[in-house]
From Swiss-Prot:
It comes from Solidesulfovibrio magneticus (strain ATCC 700980 / DSM 13731 / RS-1) (Desulfovibrio magneticus). The keyword Ribosomal protein applies. This is Large ribosomal subunit protein bL25. GO terms for cellular component: cytosolic large ribosomal subunit. This is one of the proteins that binds to the 5S RNA in the ribosome where it forms part of the central protuberance. Belongs to the bacterial ribosomal protein bL25 family. CTC subfamily. It holds the Pfam family Ribosomal_L25p. Keywords: Ribonucleoprotein, Ribosomal protein, RNA-binding, rRNA-binding. InterPro entries: Rbsml_bL25/Gln-tRNA_synth_N, Ribosomal_bL25/Gln-tRNA_synth, Ribosomal_bL25_b-dom, Ribosomal_bL25_C, Ribosomal_bL25_long, Ribosomal_L25_dom, Ribosomal_uL5_bac-type. One of its GO terms (biological process) is translation.
Length: 192
């Protein structure tokens, strides 16, 4: 991303359910800023600027968090939404050290139509996100998987996913990210 986004927040004194309800009634969102060194700071932020920022960068981009005049690099770490309204009810920010690698979830985007789908197979997406380890400023927007060469009963494994330079997938077992299965009719035809 060429231009760093920014968001201004204020520290808050009131903690607990009652204080948070009062903030939400005033169109503010309660939250917590977790410093890279382990310091937690209760904060509040206006809903509209937070919503605009989150819709642009989600959880995979570093932005400048301005706390009482001090600017800190941060990620939106966790967001809670209202169950029936399009509103953010709570947000957690994570302060990052730009020189240390962090582990984040990056969305997967599947492109193309596989050979297996052309033959009647069904695409199975096993993972919508991939955990990666990288420096905060090189977090990819998304991981694009081209599936055009995947045939029926084949998969793309996490070890086979091509990642940008400086980005490593985090996994213990070599799991399938996507696969193409035979359709139920084809599977029944093979068994007969």
């Amino acid at each position: 991303m060429s231009q760093t986004q920014s968001l201004a927040v204020k520290t808050r004194a009131g903690l607990g359910k009652g204080a948070c309800r009062k903030l939400r009634a005033d169109d503010m969102v309660p939250g917590v800023y977790y410093d890279a060194k382990g310091v937690n700071v209760p904060v509040m932020v206006e809903h509209l600027p937070l919503q605009k920022l989150y819709s642009k960068i989600a959880s995979s981009h570093v932005f400048d968090l301005q706390i009482e005049g001090e600017t800190k690099p941060a990620l939106v770490w966790k967001v809670e939404h209202h169950p029936t309204k399009p509103r953010i009810t709570h947000v957690d920010f994570y302060g990052v050290d730009l020189t240390k690698e962090i582990q984040v979830r990056v969305p997967v985007e599947v492109v193309g139509k596989s050979k297996g789908q052309v033959k009647g197979g069904q695409l199975e997406i096993h993972r919508e996100f991939i955990e990666v380890l990288c420096l905060p400023l090189v977090i990819p927007d998304k991981i694009v998987l081209d599936i055009t060469n995947v045939d029926i009963n084949e998969s793309i494994l996490i070890a086979d996913v091509v990642l940008p330079e400086g980005v490593k997938a985090v996994y213990d077992n070599n799991y399938a990210v996507i696969g193409v299965l035979a359709s139920a009719a084809e599977a029944a035809g093979e068994g007969a």
